[in-house]
A protein has these predicted regions:
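Pre-active-site segment of Zn-dependent metallo-hydrolases
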Residues: 14-20, 37-80, 87-92, 142-152, ...
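Active-site environment of divalent metal-dependent phosphoester hydrolases
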Residues: 54, 81-85, 107-109, 124-127, ...
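Binuclear metal-ion centers of metallo-dependent hydrolases, dominated by the metallo-beta-lactamase
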Residues: 111-125, 129, 209, 213-245
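A short helix->loop->beta-strand "cap" motif at the edges of active sites that frequently abuts
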Residues: 43, 95-99, 215-221
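Metallo-beta-lactamase
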Residues: 3-23, 102-168, 242-245
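Active-site-proximal loop/helix segments of hydrolase catalytic cores
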Residues: 144-214
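Active-site neighborhood of phospho(di)ester-bond hydrolases with catalytic His/Asp-centered motifs
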Residues: 46-48, 71-83, 101-104, 172-175, ...
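Active-site-proximal beta-strand elements of phosphoester/diester hydrolases
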Residues: 27-30, 44-48, 132-138, 170-176
């Protein structure tokens, strides 16, 4: 029996082909969990889409089925955890995505699945349409503490965030990470996909508040909460109310 309550977001706002059309601005949508969809002037990018067949029960309906995605210019993957690198989701959309990007280790995993993935070093930049995308550092190598994963040593460079410069502003998704000093030394972004999980391998509540105060002009899109039905796991049970208390 669960011993903690779990915050649940409002009903899902579904979207379809209309969200992928050419537009004269940039739109950002939360996909649930740690995922994000960006349409910038008609260039369509998804990051960490976990849209089907997750191995735990969910609290919400996903806003779009991957089979209904008409086209993508790129899929970005921050790291190998299956709530971010969702192999079933990517297979369902591989025929409509022009490119897949991630850190080198994640790209190797994607290539093994048959995805035409591009691997990058932290700090590298590449362009997708009008968007310039740069990998930012992340500290999330929790696997090194688990015997199950001792087949390799997980390194900082296996995880990343994405800094996305669009014609209309800067979107930053730091990814799953402990708070790093580099996270507090970025230019002012316009939007942050904001993980506030109070977990030792995530930013932690105090770290999240520190980051929010460092970038007071940024709009915060809360993520990594209200998606997986796991009230006793602090990695999934963040509560937006805690940011106000």
């Amino acid at each position: 029996m669960a011993t903690h309550k779990q915050a649940v977001p409002p009903p899902t706002v579904f979207f379809g082909e209309e969200a992928f059309q050419p537009i004269d601005h940039t739109e950002v949508r939360w996909l649930g969990s740690g995922g994000m969809f960006v349409n910038t002037r008609g260039t369509c990018i998804m990051m960490d889409p976990m849209l089907k067949d997750f191995d735990m029960p969910l609290l919400i309906d996903m806003p779009i089925a991957p089979e209904n995605i008409p086209h993508l210019d790129a899929v970005l993957i921050t790291h190998c955890d299956n709530d971010h690198y969702s192999v079933p989701s990517l297979h369902a959309m591989e025929h409509v995505s022009k490119a897949f990007h991630g850190p080198h280790y994640v790209a190797e995993l994607m290539q093994a699945e048959g995805f035409p993935a591009n691997g990058h070093t932290i700090g590298d930049s590449f362009e997708i349409g009008p968007a310039k995308i740069t990998l930012t550092p992340a500290d999330h190598a929790w696997q090194n503490e688990k015997a199950k994963y001792n087949y390799r040593v997980f390194r900082l460079e296996d995880y990343c965030g994405f800094w996305i410069e669009t014609p209309d502003g800067i979107i930053w998704a730091p990814g799953d990470s402990r708070l790093m000093k580099e996270h507090l030394e970025m230019p002012q972004p316009d939007v942050i996909l904001f993980d506030f999980s109070d977990n030792e391998w995530h930013i932690g509540l105090e770290g999240a508040i520190q980051m929010a105060n460092t970038y007071p002009e940024a709009h915060l899109i809360l993520c990594h909460w209200g998606t997986v039905d796991a009230p006793d796991l602090n990695v999934f049970n963040a509560d937006p109310q805690s940011l106000y208390d």
